[in-house]
Amino acid sequence: MMQSRTHTCGQLRIENAGEHVTLVGWMENVRVVGNNFAFLVLRDFYGTTQIVVETEEIMNIVKGINKESTISVTGTVRERASKNPKQPTGEIEVVPEKIELLGRCQYNELPFEINRSRDADETQRLKYRYLDLRNPAVKKNIILRCNVIAALRQAMMAHDFLEITTPILTASSPEGARDYLVPARKHPGKFYALPQAPQQFKQLLMTSGFDRYFQIAPCFRDEDARGDRSPGEFYQLDMEMAFAAQDDVFAVIEDVLPPIFAKYGKYNIASSAPFRRIAYKDALETYGSDKPDLRIDLTCKNISDLFESSEFEPFKGQTVKAVPISNCHLTRKQIEKLLTDCEVQAGTKGYWFKMDENGELAGGVAKFVQGCKDELTQRLGLTPNTLVVIAAGASATKLTGVLIKTFGANVEGHMDKERYEFCWIVDFPMYEIGDESGELEFCHNPFSMPGGGAATLDKAIRGEIDPLTITAQQYDLVCNGIELSSGAVRNHDPEIMIKAFELVRLGEDDVKKKFPAMYNAFCYGAPPHAGIAPGVDRMVMLLAGEDSIREIIPFPMNKNAQDILMGAPSEVTQKQLDELHIASPRTKNKTGSRRTAPHRRGSFCMGPERGDLRLFLLQFRRPGRII
């Protein structure tokens, strides 16, 4: 029977010298220095302790134990002769009188060294995630995640929010990404969906008479992975407030997040309230992005008028935007390398020139802009050693956003990296012209309250104003160039909702059919309400200073939405499929070709109804929006 530990492996100090103790943990390393003399490192969740073997009996036991086996060590604490000030337990060691094997590691070789697991191939790390997580450098991100979630929960409750859980099995609804569908055994041919967000439920809670709601909500979206987005499952701090406007939501977030970022973040400085507010249009004009990184002091200037009649064809009659970068001492090679990286990201060509130390324009396209040197100097504030990077054409705005972030991070003196800088992006357009349809569509969230309410929509319906000029009471929360969340003042009035959809060629019946619960609830008197849902995973990624969101998730999927550790997704038995009334995709006809599942009850396919839903979705929502 295992003897209970008296201390953890990170607990013992010089004051414990002479004490009789029992430690348990993983045998991290063994260094044999003589016939009956060896140093062991014992590791548990809390830290490491050095064990010094000095007897033949104990040495024989140690020789039969592989690294990463779990053991119990009972012995006496003594002061180290050679201390290690880098370790909390570096002043002591334990001399064992007894070592007991608790759980044997059956392999002589590990897939990777535990303390170097972050350098291993990612597929190996995910396959052996339980080994990867033994690495303190990996484990600390999960601990950080736990601490941040606990702090968020405590802060929200201090603001009188109630934590209410909402259903995981629900109806499929158009929210921007593909649903994860769950077949209903008792209802052949019908499906539940895992919620992309608790959007409708939290609005229904407001209609039910609850005043302030929150939860750490699991969300499920069948979308592709990227650095700041994990496929499949993610979590958000979902919140909603009744009888609230935009400023009420802002006040809560501005009070909750900065202290948590300052306490748990890699940097200890965070924006204080109020956060800067930037109109969507101004963000694009000034920063080339609706996700500006305000730690960077660079902005872009529109200089199109200077090149309306230019002989340089790429600039002639085009939108031309410039980003001046003062005190730039990059070489030509360095400039062109960074510019090429930006071109790849934005998918369009960039240009540059520089005012040298003598005040002359040189390099890049300098010879094509010499004719307007004085105007450029005045408009861009050029001084010696100022680099100017330029974007032109239809993708100029997109490229300037990339130029600002790339050069801002690589030219010394233009980015205060060690801080968290928040801002709100406000006044989003309600509508836009769809790239594929060429017709009016909702720009983001169709259930945001339009600026000006019903009166503005009526004018647009009558043709008195351009629908593209209507703004939505929607807002994004951005930190260090990363979108943490979207939120909105909700459209709680059924009549205004119908008018909003009418402009995109959808009628009252469409709204009632696709969103019956919410529409009907609003007809019984809904309060004005507003909310937001910052992404927990993205917040923790920022706080940890990680580039990949997978580093802060205990058991993440890979980029291809596969759980390598558990083997998901996996095939299931024909019996399971039959119980769910699903035709097997592996079924083949007599010629050996794959049989197409028919559009009938019990088939696992997208029927006409589901197809209509996707078409409906595409009319009003961009993929992957977090609301």
Language-model features and meaning:
Residues T591, T596-A597:
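Ala/Thr-enriched low-complexity intrinsically disordered regions
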Residues M1-K590, G602:
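Class II aminoacyl-tRNA synthetase catalytic cores and aaRS-like
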